[in-house]
A protein has these predicted regions:
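Ser/Thr/Asn(+Pro)-rich, low-complexity disordered segments
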Residues: 1-10
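Generic hydrophobic/packing signal
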Residues: 2, 16-18, 77
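Terminal, charged accessory segments of proteins
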Residues: 10-25
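Conserved oxyanion/phosphate-binding beta-strand-loop segments in alpha/beta enzyme cores
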Residues: 23-33, 90-94
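A gly/proline- and charged-residue-enriched helix-loop-helix capping module
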Residues: 33-71
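Active-site loop segments of alpha/beta catalytic cores
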Residues: 56-317
Length: 317
């Protein structure tokens, strides 16, 4: 009953070699912390001096590894499903995610406030690495279109290439700023968006946002190059997003999973969804439910949710 898309083929991604033992030159080992699967990272940047150990990676296409992976999957699937090579850049404009992984959230926030020059140097290195990765992917000539995926389903971005060769401006990219949730708009512009922008301008279509509250940053995000989808999380003010975005961008209205999966029935949630879709009349929008951890004993809840969403969307079409 929903619109999850499954292609009639199995994709095998290109194999990349990286000239650093760890992507940014530093290992961030995972440390298990609970019997239920919880874990934490051992962040390798612990001092100011550690920032200088950040390395800018260079990626290269490995045809032998790629061919072996294709062959293995073809042998496994046989005639059941065709196998295709897929290729996307090995890094995206997720500088805040990469740096938090290396430094840790509390330390990163302190650095933004008291050691901003360190953050700027780190962001510059991360951006250089991302740009190298995107150029390397495009130069292989193997990039494959990604407009058929569930979160970025659209017509071909910037049309079908006349020569058949997909380039970055034919691709979607999806990025966010969750680690900057508590950072001011001005500091987000200075320390993140200014570094994301050179990467995003190479792509044909951009989706921005995830679970962060972007209410105070709507105008900043709207000015990003090639923005097509503004993600309005369950914590972002939908009214303000509609007011600023109107029909100029697609609004991806994400639902709070707990509101859908935990109650005994959907009656209270139905009021919320109905009111939101009423407000979204005249806009281009998507309603997305993700980040599910449990159905709390309601095995049919997702089917119920999909039916309800379709019914209310048709009512307010």
């Amino acid at each position: 009953g929903d619109d999850e898309i499954f292609e009639p083929w199995w994709g095998v991604g290109v194999a990349w070699d990286c000239d650093t033992p760890h992507t940014w030159g530093l290992a961030a080992p995972q440390v298990d912390s609970t019997n239920m699967g919880g874990f934490r990272y051992e962040h390798p940047i612990k001092t100011e001096a550690d920032y200088e150990r950040l390395a800018v990676p260079t990626f290269s296409y490995n045809p032998e590894k790629t061919e072996r992976a294709l062959s293995r999957m073809s042998d496994l699937l046989g005639d059941a499903l065709p196998v295709r090579l897929t290729c996307q850049p090995p890094l995206a404009a997720m500088q805040a995610y990469y740096l938090e992984h290396l430094r840790g959230m509390e330390a990163l926030v302190n650095d933004l406030a008291f050691r901003p020059e360190l953050v700027h140097r780190a962001m510059a290195k991360l951006t250089e690495g991302i740009l190298r990765a995107t150029r390397a992917a495009e130069e292989t000539g193997l990039l494959t279109a990604n407009h058929h995926e569930p979160m970025s389903c659209s017509d071909p971005v910037n049309g079908q290439p006349a020569d058949g060769r997909v380039r970055l401006h034919n691709l979607w990219t999806s990025v966010n700023s969750q680690e900057f949730q508590v950072i001011s708009p001005a500091m987000q512009e200075e320390f993140l968006l200014s570094y994301q922008r050179p990467v995003l301008q190479q792509y044909g279509a951009v989706q921005y946002g995830c679970c962060e509250d972007l209410t105070q940053k709507i105008e900043l995000i709207r000015r990003l190059p090639n923005l097509r989808v503004f993600v309005c999380s369950a914590w972002t003010d939908l009214d303000k997003v509609i007011e600023r975005c109107g029909s100029s961008h697609t609004i991806m209205w994400r639902q709070a999973a707990a509101a859908v999966t935990l109650p005994d029935d959907l009656s209270a949630y139905q009021q919320h969804l109905n009111e939101g879709l009423r407000k979204l009349q005249g806009c281009h929008y998507q309603v997305v439910l993700r980040e599910l951890e449990t159905l709390k004993g309601h095995p049919d809840r997702l089917k119920e949710w999909a039916r309800l969403g379709i019914e209310l969307a048709e009512r307010h079409a």
